């Protein structure tokens, strides 16, 4: 087995004996004017081999971290630097399976879970019981498999989809896991993306999900995570991308007749454009600082509705460059250390900006276009 699979799946991200003292981010020199592709490759390859101890608290999210690394390498044109067979075997080991077909009616979700920490030996053979399938982990698992070119017809999609509908609530929202949890637009999006990637909508009631999404739209045109909540960049992305994946809104709403649209694209456009701050970056909510990840969350919404030409791209690029680390990767704010989450969405943002040498983006799925079926 390759070192990569061992490091991703190890019990510890780094030796616990290592000194874990706090340290302050280094003072950054003047930001580079160039997208440092080679440094980003080195950063992701380092993370692919060994996760630093700072990620110990995210042990439950190993699949998500792997998605950021492997999909990030694809954006950088380096998909072939991973052992696809080893990665596929590792990802597939996280799928839960029902004991029998009757088990599909027990209310559990048989998707993918995010970590070995939610598996437990249950018999003399050492087989593992999967008891923590999660919608977000399932999205990440399928995303990785698509990115490495794995045939999704080889997974037990029938059990996954039949059991996924157990998570949908009466109001159309989704729980992330069968033992309960928050219900909001994040998990509606995960469900829609899962159905889209598996090319089957048997796992959700689309009409009910659509109505829930529309109930989350605020007076200002944006969407909150739940009905009646403040408009938020991430929630707005989940709403618009879900509606697009489900086929309820088309391409380039602003250029087409919007009178028959189920949303008001002009009001949404205005809200999104107001999120670009004076420093060129995008904020997630009113009166919040600019943050690297919202260059994707808001930028992708504008791309989906046909309003991306109105982004001040030079200013956005300058902000993103200020968040580019000299070590590779991107930080949340200028001058901080990079992390995998903001690095990945930094790469997707630069793909939206059509940075030379990056793979094009499928904004609906947040994946490289070549990994997106039917787009």
Swiss-Prot record:
Disordered: annotated span: 1-33
Binding, geranylgeranyl diphosphate: 232-234, 285-288, 294-297
One Pfam family here: Prenyltrans
Residues the record lists as binding Zn(2+): 291, 293, 342
Cofactor needs: Zn(2+); Mg(2+)
One BP term from GO: protein geranylgeranylation
pH dependence: Optimum pH is 7.9-8.5 for CTIL substrate.
InterPro entries the record matches: GGTase_I_beta, PGGT1B-like, Prenyltrans, Terpenoid_cyclase/PrenylTrfase
PFTB repeats: 157-199, 206-247, 265-306, 313-354
Cellular component GO terms held in the UniProt record: CAAX-protein geranylgeranyltransferase complex
EC number of this enzyme: 2.5.1.59
Alphabetically ordered keywords of this record: Acetylation, Magnesium, Metal-binding, Prenyltransferase, Repeat, Transferase, Zinc
Keyword Protease: no
Catalytic activity as recorded in UniProt: geranylgeranyl diphosphate + L-cysteinyl-[protein] = S-geranylgeranyl-L-cysteinyl-[protein] + diphosphate
Enzyme class: transferase
Cofactor binding description: Binds 1 zinc ion per subunit.
Entry note: thermal dependence: Optimum temperature is 30-37 degrees Celsius for CTIL substrate.
Tissues/organs with expression: Expressed in roots, leaves, stems, flowers and siliques.
SUPFAM superfamilies to which the protein is assigned, alphabetical: Terpenoid cyclases/Protein prenyltransferases (SSF48239)
Protein name: Geranylgeranyl transferase type-1 subunit beta
